[in-house]
């Protein structure tokens, strides 16, 4: 029986799939941290005492004390949260 090109390609694809699965399972089972975590660079999220709701016009009620509204999907009730930490959002304005 002759070893043809189609059989060779099928074996090559099979070996590539097995190799890829082996690499994926090895990295997925890793318990180590990919980067050192520092409390200096962390962000702390806290729930505020108030909730926020969507008004009939589609606008949300304001959160106070440095908090902002977070809601899920099409929910009309959300929670006010506050972020505290070392974070820097990119700005579209030119910095001087």
From Swiss-Prot:
Residues 1-28 form the signal peptide. Glycans are attached at residues 51, 74. It is found in: Secreted. GO terms for molecular function: C-X-C chemokine binding. It comes from the Eukaryota. Keywords: Disulfide bond, Glycoprotein, Secreted, Signal. Disulfide bonds join 48-67, 52-69, 63-80. One of its GO terms (cellular component) is extracellular region. Coiled coil: none annotated. Salivary chemokine-binding protein which binds to host chemokines CXCL1, CXCL2, CXCL3, CXCL5, CXCL6, CXCL11 and CXCL13. This is Evasin P1078. It comes from Ixodes ricinus (Common tick). The lineage of its organism: Eukaryota, Metazoa, Ecdysozoa, Arthropoda, Chelicerata.
């Amino acid at each position: 029986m002759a070893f043809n090109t189609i059989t060779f390609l099928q074996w090559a694809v099979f070996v590539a799939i097995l190799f890829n699965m082996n690499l994926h399972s090895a990295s997925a089972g890793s318990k180590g941290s990919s980067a050192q975590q520092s409390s200096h660079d962390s962000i702390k999220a806290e729930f505020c005492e108030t909730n926020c709701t969507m008004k009939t016009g589609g606008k949300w009620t304001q959160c106070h004390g440095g908090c902002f509204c977070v809601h899920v999907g099409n929910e009309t009730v959300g929670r006010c949260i506050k972020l505290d930490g070392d974070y820097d959002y990119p700005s579209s304005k030119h910095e001087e």
